[in-house]
UniProtKB/Swiss-Prot annotation:
Pfam families: CoA_trans. Residues 1-36 form a transit peptide. SMART domains: CoA_trans. Pathway: Ketone metabolism; succinyl-CoA degradation; acetoacetyl-CoA from succinyl-CoA: step 1/1. It catalyses: a 3-oxo acid + succinyl-CoA = a 3-oxoacyl-CoA + succinate. Homodimer. Belongs to the 3-oxoacid CoA-transferase family. One of its GO terms (cellular component) is mitochondrion. This is Probable succinyl-CoA:3-ketoacid coenzyme A transferase, mitochondrial. The active site is at E342 (5-glutamyl coenzyme a thioester intermediate). One of its GO terms (biological process) is ketone body catabolic process.
Length: 521
């Protein structure tokens, strides 16, 4: 009988008596006992010692993979003055939106405000501090902390307010639109002719994590896309609290199936009564896809049908939210495009049929999706590593404004519209990235969106490769400006000149604007 088995089978007095011979085994028993003590009886018990003014890393992407029970527990335990580091803050009445409603959050460090109206209201009215951080940079700052790296260089955000400073962190409560606290400029350095920004790691006092299941030692598994920011955040706090849907005995989760090893898990809670709402429910069309009948819808379809011609068989592409998500409707049968979603999915498939949706499987627009055969799923840090590392063949995204030299603005209208940059800054800043902007040629007010210089805060400087609108297609040279290469068949070059607020060259091979056919298969 092995020595450990004899000790475990011995009377209590024998277990407690430490001798030189059994000292090592006693340490193992002590460790095993303390590891099993990780399991807390309730979420409230697990979070009750979090102090006021703590910095919390809170996992999730939209409402996918958020620690529902732990967040609700904090609304009951009542901590104040919290700094929350999270990709976004859920919605008004769920996720971190609950802590915003109870005024328990003093500051957010996020990449995206999204559809949370209360988040935007508190920020614009000076009630809440907000440090905008590009999504990939946020993931890497967290990952770096867990890996013991104090700072790193990234191309993301160079030439924007994120690097140059001046982004509003806090507005005045008394003077509408007045910036009370602005971000500071960051150190830059050039490597191999490319400009980089230095970013510092983000440590948390506590991390609030949602996983699928764990064993009693704290080895954890995520399910589908619910790993997202939970993955790197597990490793970057002094105390990581994990809530799961199932707790099993050690050994049930095979070693190769462990996503986060027990060394990173300090407290474990069995979650209850999960709601798992889907932020933007979308479902597969029943029957043929019908063309839009509205003017706005027709414009979007024209843009998407042209954007689809940018795809080549076998390429890896990232599509932004909005118009870019329509482009796959025009990919022909037998044509493979590996769609990457910034929340960690490679191989995004179509919307699910109603009734088959899975809240743990969403895209960057927080819509339910399916997976194609051969798909894979990674954490947010790995997702942006492949973006920042220039592994994407193409990025297609929308814009508020573009300049003639390829500058892009699509994340903020100061004092008015607050969405955040999300992953856009990372996507357009990757060295050598091919960036296709898709947008209406003019705003709702009829004002040109292609300008000499962007008037809004930049998402990227000199980053656009091609602009596709509902009227024309331009190639972009970051030194020489725009060249008109295609015009919609019912328009003339003069029409384009009237609605474009900058000069442009006209290609010798100017042709009618291409349109991919709608795939009804």
């Amino acid at each position: 009988m092995p020595i450990l088995s004899k000790i475990w089978a011995a009377p209590a007095a024998g277990i407690l008596r430490k001798t030189p011979r059994n000292a090592h085994q006693m340490r193992l028993i002590s460790m095993t006992s303390s590891m099993k003590a990780k399991v807390f009886n309730s979420a409230e018990e697990a979070v009750k010692d979090i102090p006021d003014n703590a910095k919390l890393l809170v996992g999730g992407f939209g409402l996918c993979g958020i620690p529902e029970n732990l967040i609700q527990a904090i609304t009951k335990t009542g901590q104040k003055g919290l700094t929350c580091v999270s990709n976004n803050a859920g919605v008004d009445n769920w996720g971190l939106g609950l802590l915003l409603q109870t005024r328990q959050i003093k500051k957010m460090i996020s990449s995206y405000v999204g559809e949370n109206g209360e988040f935007a209201r508190q920020y614009l009215s000076g009630e809440l501090e907000l440090e905008f951080t590009p999504q990939g940079t946020l993931a890497e700052r967290i990952r770096a902390a867990g890996a013991g790296v104090p700072a790193f260089y990234t191309p993301t955000g160079y030439g924007t307010q994120i690097q140059e400073g001046g982004a509003p962190i806090k507005y005045s409560k008394t003077e509408k639109g007045k910036i009370e606290v602005a971000s500071k400029a960051k150190e830059t350095r050039q490597f191999n002719g490319i400009n980089y920004v230095m970013e510092e790691a983000i440590w948390g006092d506590f991390a609030l994590i949602k996983a699928w299941r764990a064993d009693t030692l704290g080895n954890i598994q995520f399910r589908h896309a619910a790993g997202n920011f939970n993955n790197p955040m597990c490793k970057a706090s002094k105390c990581t609290i994990v809530e799961v849907e199932e707790i099993v005995e050690p050994g049930v989760i095979a070693p190769n199936d462990v996503h986060i090893p027990s060394i990173y898990c300090h407290r474990l809670v069995l979650g209850k009564n999960y709601k798992k709402p889907i932020e933007r429910p979308m479902f597969a069309h029943e029957g043929p896809i019908k063309p839009s009948t509205s003017a706005a819808g027709k414009s979007r379809e024209i843009i998407a049908a042209r954007a689809a011609l940018e795809f080549t068989d076998g390429m890896y592409a990232n599509l932004g939210i909005g118009i870019p998500t329509l482009a796959p409707n025009y990919i022909p049968n037998g044509f493979t495009v590996h769609l990457q979603s910034e929340n960690g999915i490679i191989g995004v498939g179509p919307y699910p049929r109603k009734g088959t949706e899975d809240a743990d499987l969403i895209n960057a627009g927080k819509e339910p999706i399916t997976l194609l055969k051969g798909a894979s799923i990674v954490g947010s840090d790995e997702s942006f590593a492949m973006i920042r590392g220039s592994h994407m063949d193409i990025t297609v995204l929308g814009a508020l404004q573009c300049s003639q030299f390829g500058d892009l603005a699509n994340w903020m209208i100061p004092g008015k519209l607050v969405k955040g940059m999300g992953g856009a800054m990372d996507l357009v800043s990757a060295p050598g990235a091919r960036v296709i902007v898709v947008m209406e040629h003019v705003s709702k007010n009829g004002e040109p969106k292609i300008l000499e210089h962007c008037e809004l805060p930049l998402t990227g400087k000199g980053v656009i490769s091609r602009i596709i609108t509902d009227m024309a297609v331009f190639d972009v040279d970051t030194k020489n400006g725009l060249t008109l290469i295609e015009v919609r068949k019912d328009l003339t070059v003069d029409d384009i000149k009237k609605l474009t607020a900058c000069k442009f060259e006209i290609s010798e091979n100017l042709k009618p604007m291409g349109q991919a056919p709608l795939n009804q298969g």
